[in-house]
């Protein structure tokens, strides 16, 4: 038979119960504290992780900002370099595009040899080492209307001319050395004995010459238009006067004829009447002695 356990006292039970309850409560409290600590630790870890994430995000943002700032700084640097380049290029471009000073010289020829062409004049000057020559202009000779026409020779003659040299110094030396000297060259040349008549024009430009030539041309054309209009008016007046004179002459002729007729009518006019022929009747014969002529009467008188 197994021994039956004795029942414990209620106090002991209650005491045991109290101890157990206290232990349980203590254990409960301890468990609760540990759970709280765990929760707190979890919260801290979460907060730390959040803070770390936030810090990581902030670091990323800062890095991005730094990268953007670096990019902006790089762009600013490149723009500054480009601006410097552009500013450095601008004065160069301006210097390149700056208009060059007029360094050309112009010589005026007051007279030219007959039938001398522009190309021949340029060749004569360049053979004497006066060059380079940039432009040559010769004004043709204007012959008056009263001058006789040249039928045999059709070559042009020039009255004066201008020659532009690339250097003013060359133009001055050319004018000083060749003025009032013979053209020279070959002895049998066409222009050997002709004399140079030239002068260096100080401060004269080719544009001034072109303006002068255009002005003279316009004046000449205007003068020609005025002369043509005047000639047309004179022709018109002459034709009108000629036609009017013809009309007056016709009227005068008619008046003269009328006057002659009046004079002829004023003379005495003998009136002449035309007599009609008288016809004989049936009873009367043509042998009526009363109507015989003198000849018949004389013949009859001789017979009888």
From Swiss-Prot:
One GO MF annotation is: RNA binding
Write the record's keywords in alphabetical order, separated by commas: Nucleus, Ribosome biogenesis, RNA-binding, rRNA processing
Q: Which domain of life is it from?
A: Eukaryota
Q: Does the keyword rRNA processing apply?
A: yes
Instruction: Point to the regions of Basic and acidic residues compositional bias.
Output: 70-96
Where is it mainly found? nucleus
Show where the RRM domain sits: 105-195
Start-end of Basic residues biased regions? 41-51
InterPro entries, from UniProt? Answer: ABT1/Esf2, ABT1/ESF2_RRM, Nucleotide-bd_a/b_plait_sf, RBD_domain_sf
Question: Do you know which Gene3D superfamilies this protein is assigned to?
Answer: 3.30.70.330
Q: List the subcellular locations.
A: Nucleus, Nucleolus
| Segments of skewed composition (Acidic residues) | 55-69
Alphabetical GO biological process terms: endonucleolytic cleavage in 5'-ETS of tricistronic rRNA transcript (SSU-rRNA, 5.8S rRNA, LSU-rRNA); endonucleolytic cleavage in ITS1 to separate SSU-rRNA from 5.8S rRNA and LSU-rRNA from tricistronic rRNA transcript (SSU-rRNA, 5.8S rRNA, LSU-rRNA); endonucleolytic cleavage to generate mature 5'-end of SSU-rRNA from (SSU-rRNA, 5.8S rRNA, LSU-rRNA); small-subunit processome assembly
Give the protein's function. Answer: Involved in the small subunit (SSU) processome assembly and function, and in the 18S rRNA synthesis. Required for the early cleavages at sites A0, A1 and A2.
As for family, the record states: Belongs to the ESF2/ABP1 family.
* PANTHER family, A to Z: ACTIVATOR OF BASAL TRANSCRIPTION 1
**What's the protein name?**
Pre-rRNA-processing protein esf2
Organism, by scientific name, is: Aspergillus niger (strain ATCC MYA-4892 / CBS 513.88 / FGSC A1513)
- Name of the coding gene: esf2
